[in-house]
Amino acid sequence: NIGRDASVTFRQPDASSTALNRIQQGSPSEIFGRLSANGQVYLINQNGILFGRSAVVNTHALTVSTLNISDSVFNDGITNAINQPQDNAAFAADPGMDPNATIEVQSGAVLRTDEGGRIMMFAPVIENRGEISTPGGQAILAASSDRVFLANSDDPNLRGLLVEVDTGGDVTNLGRIVAERGNVTLLGFAVNQNGVARATTSVNLNGSVYL
């Protein structure tokens, strides 16, 4: 948890460095303060994660999930899991995960990455009422109650990772998701898009929005 007047900073060797945080508390994580990193940050809590109205997140990349990631997948790379016949999900639910576990971004919360970064959210229920911004990168909100699959695209015209879920959940966007010259992907059994999901296009780079 990060209180309203508190801050947490990860000082990492470079932008490719990754901090994996497995949160074992019996309740959702609550982030109301500032979270900063010059690299990648993973927040894993099977009970849910809340970004409150005063939350400000600035990282190179951010992954937030109620589904677990195994040590082998984390070490080998999330896009390599699909090539493994016995464990081909990048993220998978543990038996004790709350089937209604939620990732919520409240109105007023701001989540940003550096140029070319990525913000990914995986949970049975995902609700965004805040601002998510990843210039030249990718924003993925994929709702699933069991497994998420990620793969690199062979098509150079497609921006970002390809995403599939086994059993889809509910995604709601009432806020702003902006990926200038990048990609926005909203995926689930029910996708409620009543906010802004925008990916701009430049002369050399095509933006895209996938629902």
Task: Describe the predicted segments one by one.
Residues 1-211:
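Extracellular and secretory-pathway beta-repeat/beta-biased strand scaffolds
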